[in-house]
Each structure stands twice: as C-alpha cells, then as structure tokens.
Swiss-Prot record:
Organism taxonomic ancestry: Bacteria, Bacillati, Bacillota, Bacilli, Lactobacillales
Superkingdom assignment: Bacteria
Enzyme class: hydrolase
Annotated EC: 3.4.21.88
DNA-binding interval(s): 29-49
Protein name in the entry: LexA repressor
Active site (UniProt): S133, K171
Function: Represses a number of genes involved in the response to DNA damage (SOS response), including recA and lexA. In the presence of single-stranded DNA, RecA interacts with LexA causing an autocatalytic cleavage which disrupts the DNA-binding part of LexA, leading to derepression of the SOS regulon and eventually DNA repair.
Alphabetized Pfam families for the sequence: LexA_DNA_bind (PF01726), Peptidase_S24 (PF00717)
Residues the UniProt record annotates as site (Cleavage): A96, G97
Quaternary assembly: Homodimer.
Native organism: Leuconostoc mesenteroides subsp. mesenteroides (strain ATCC 8293 / DSM 20343 / BCRC 11652 / CCM 1803 / JCM 6124 / NCDO 523 / NBRC 100496 / NCIMB 8023 / NCTC 12954 / NRRL B-1118 / 37Y)
Length: 212
C-alpha cells in the first residue's frame, strides 16, 4: 500500500511540474484530480501537503498564482529531471535574406539556457543571423536567434524554414490557399513564395553580442 501511495504522490508532482512548464502557472485541484484519477479534493490536498513536507513542493499562498506552488530542485530530482543548467547548441548560420544552405548537424558552440526557457531544455538550438530581412522586428545581422524545434507553425510565427534545396531562412510564416509565404520584416524586400516548405523551428528568443 505504501508503494501505491508514493506512486500517486509522484504522479501529482509530475503533473504539477508538466502543467506549470506548459502553461506558466500550476494546475487547479480539479485538473490534478482529472490527470491522476482522483475525485476527492481532500485526497489531492493531502498529497500536496505531504509533497510540501518532503520538500518536493514549495507552497506560498501569498504569491501570485504563477508561483503559489513550485516544484523544488529536490522535487525535480525525484522526477529524474536535471537541475543543472542546460546548454543551447549553436548549429551554424541562417539568413535573414536570400535562403542559403546553413544548418549544420554538429554544434559549433554552446550557450546557457535562459531561466525562462529552461522548460524547453533539449528542444532548443541557436543560429547566427546573416542579413537584414527581419530588421523591422529587431533581428539584426550578426544576432543569434534561439529556436524551439517544431515541425508546424501558426500563421504569423517567426520560423526557421527550409526549402526543397535544403536552404534555410528566418522569416514570418503564412500558410495561404495554394502556397506558403515566407514574409520578410523589411519593407524593401519581397516575400518568398513556396509550394513546399519544411519548418525547423519557431524563433522564441534573441541574443546579441554587443549593442552599438
């Protein structure tokens, strides 16, 4: 019985961590119950209190909802999640201009993951930007973009996309009636129209070595 009880507590802990990573705030008691198969709110509260006592959760009702319950480093270790800061591999160059063959398979260097992106550890890569087609949104020649790996994109997302010739570019993505439009953020540049496109990832961050 003790093993079953511990297992259910870990399920609660894991769901709290996953929901908070995905949404930016912890789940409700009802959501926890639905996820782990518990209908009694008092039972769920009991699991949470025991997780707090074990040091796996930190609960502070005085904080905003986003930080009212947090999984501690000890709790993350219990879930098998490393608390050592991860690194983002830099995989070459991407153009903010005419597409070029750019993305390499092996990292040329590594950057520490910012705290606000730690939940995406393992799903991130960086590319050096060459060109000025995205200047309207502040992506400049020489910047590094942080990209979350994903194969799909919503209209308006800034993505790293690859055409049939394995040429990569960073542009704003639009799926239209019979083609895909990769839109520059530079008023002097025309969009790229493609019949087929592969999405390598969505741009979610930016790093700049120096401010001029």
């Amino acid at each position: 019985m003790a093993i079953t009880q511990e297992s259910k507590q870990i399920q609660v802990l894991r769901f709290i961590h996953e929901a908070q990573s995905e949404n930016g705030y912890p789940p409700t008691v009802r959501e926890i119950g639905e996820a782990v198969g518990l209908s009694s709110s008092s039972t769920i509260h009991g699991h949470i209190e025991r997780l707090v006592k074990k040091g796996y959760l930190l609960k502070d009702a005085s904080k905003p909802r986003a930080r009212a319950i947090e999984v501690t480093d000890i709790g993350l270790e219990m879930l098998g999640i490393s608390t050592t800061p991860g690194k983002i591999p830099v995989l070459g160059m991407v153009t903010a201009g005419t597409p070029i063959l750019a993305v390499e398979e092996e990292a040329t260097e590594f950057f520490p993951i910012p705290d606000n992106l730690m939940q995406f550890d393992g799903d991130l890569f960086m590319l050096n930007v060459h060109g000025d087609s995205m200047v309207n949104i502040g992506i400049l020649d020489g910047d590094k973009v942080i990209v979350r790996k994903q194969e799909n994109a919503d209209n308006g997302d800034v993505v790293v996309a690859m055409n049939d010739n394995n040429e990569a570019t960073v542009k704003r993505f639009f799926r239209e009636a019979d083609h895909y439009r990769l839109q520059p953020e530079n008023n002097s540049m025309a969009p790229i129209i493609l019949q087929k496109v592969s999405i390598l990832g969505k741009v979610i961050g930016l790093y700049r070595d120096a401010i001029y």
